[in-house]
Amino acid sequence: MGSADPQNAAELERAWGRSLYRWWEFYNHEYLRDALRRPLLQLGDAAQRLGEWDSALRRITISRQHICSDSWTDVLDTLRHEMAHQYVWEVLQAHAEDPHGEAFRLVCRKLRCDPAATARRVNPERTENDPVELRIARLVTKLLSLGDSPNEHEAQAAVNKAQRLLLEYNVDLVDSDAERGFERRQLGQVKGRHPAWELWLAMILNEFFFVEVLWTRSYDAARDLEGTVLEVYGTVTNLAMAEYVHAFLSNVLERLWSGYRQEQGLSSNRERMRYFAGVLQGFHGKLGLQRADLQASVETEALVWQGDERLQSYYRYHNPRIQTRQTGGVAASEAFRHGVEAGRRVTLRPPIESATGFGGYLYSGSGER
């Protein structure tokens, strides 16, 4: 658990229990119209079994290791899975049916959870088993590596080609109505309040990297902190790219600010958030111009991205009630304006290639300035 103090560890586990109960009550009200009676919720020591419903004791058990090792999104998926078992047993009273039979699967759909959520996930990077997605990932990685060329025009041409390849891949998926699976994952930290630069980063992923995004309620179990976190939805390939871009840009912001602060002789970090927002606004504008140039260069409308209705349906299925909020923006200080200029010079660098082609990220100090 990472806590050397048994008293602190016990207090943290009690906090986990309170959070699980709050989410149980929310799902029971939101999806099941308060059909369930409150069960006993406890933490367990199983490593492979993430959760369990015990009908005799009216008890749902969630693995401690699951909470420590996996995202809160996965923990809540397990909780809803066990609530589905509880519903089948206590409300439908389908005692003779197979535990994962038709009634159970229908309740899982009602609760928006994975029918197979209780066995330890071995996240087998799906692109390894999909030659098309693996080829796309590796080609994009190769093209981004060409973006390191000292010849500015060659570098930009390589990055443009990578963007076109991703666009062609996604347009072809939608136009051919190819079978494709969607997933969701969380990026960044759970926070009570997110600064403007994080909102710009989410907008960049949504508008240019073929994923749907949502600031969703979540919980950081290690810090006992409730707040919101960025959740992205898409195909495995697009999620891998979005995760890479998120990590790359977050890393670049810190490095650019460090250099800018030294150049300007700034003694504090007071302008740091404004500078970050400026960089990402500038990078957002650069990507918009690049996409416009790409659209103008094609002779047909075949490469115009109209969105993915299947992805939007998946997104709406998991989020039946979505609220949109407006933000107040950022005061245009000198640091913000300098950040915009720096953002227009940012270029994506190649990830460290893994089996999927998007394993980690590299940073080139000369490429962003």
Enumerate the predicted regions with their spans.
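Short active-site segment of divalent metal-dependent hydrolases/proteases
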Residues: A84, V88
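Short pre-active-site segment immediately N-terminal to the catalytic Zn-binding motif
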Residues: I60-L79, V91-D98
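Post-HExxH zinc-binding segment in Zn-dependent metallohydrolases
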Residues: R33-D34, S55, V91-N129
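Extended, helix-rich structural scaffolds rather than catalytic motifs
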Residues: G51, L111, P115-R121, E125-L134, ...
